[in-house]
């Protein structure tokens, strides 16, 4: 899977796309910003944050 840097609203939009109706929890303290903004992350990384 391709990885990409996702920051701010782009990160939230990507979570909406990946998680769909399951929803997701966005807590910067969980490290998602470090994992997906500071470093590139994949769809599989994003799925870890879905509810």
UniProtKB/Swiss-Prot annotation:
Q: Name one GO biological process term.
A: glucose metabolic process
A Pfam entry, by short name? Insulin
Q: Which superkingdom, per the lineage?
A: Eukaryota
Cross-referenced InterPro entries, in alphabetical order?
A: Insulin, Insulin-like, Insulin-like_sf, Insulin_CS, Insulin_family
State the coiled-coil residue ranges: none
Keyword annotations of the record: Carbohydrate metabolism, Disulfide bond, Glucose metabolism, Hormone, Secreted
Compartments reported by the entry: Secreted
Instruction: Give this protein's Gene Ontology molecular function annotations.
Output: hormone activity
Read off the SMART domains from this record: IlGF (SM00078)
Q: Give me the Gene Ontology terms describing cellular component.
A: extracellular space
Q: Which cysteines are joined by disulfide bonds?
A: 7-37, 19-50, 36-41
Question: What function does the entry list?
Answer: Insulin decreases blood glucose concentration. It increases cell permeability to monosaccharides, amino acids and fatty acids. It accelerates glycolysis, the pentose phosphate cycle, and glycogen synthesis in liver.
Identify its protein family. Belongs to the insulin family.
Binding partners and assembly: Heterodimer of a B chain and an A chain linked by two disulfide bonds.
The name this protein carries in UniProt is: Insulin
């Amino acid at each position: 899977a391709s990885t990409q840097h996702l920051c701010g609203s782009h990160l939230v939009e990507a979570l909406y796309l990946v998680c769909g109706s399951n929803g997701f929890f966005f807590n910067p303290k969980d490290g998602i910003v470090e994992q997906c903004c500071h470093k590139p992350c994949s769809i599989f990384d994003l799925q870890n944050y879905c509810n």
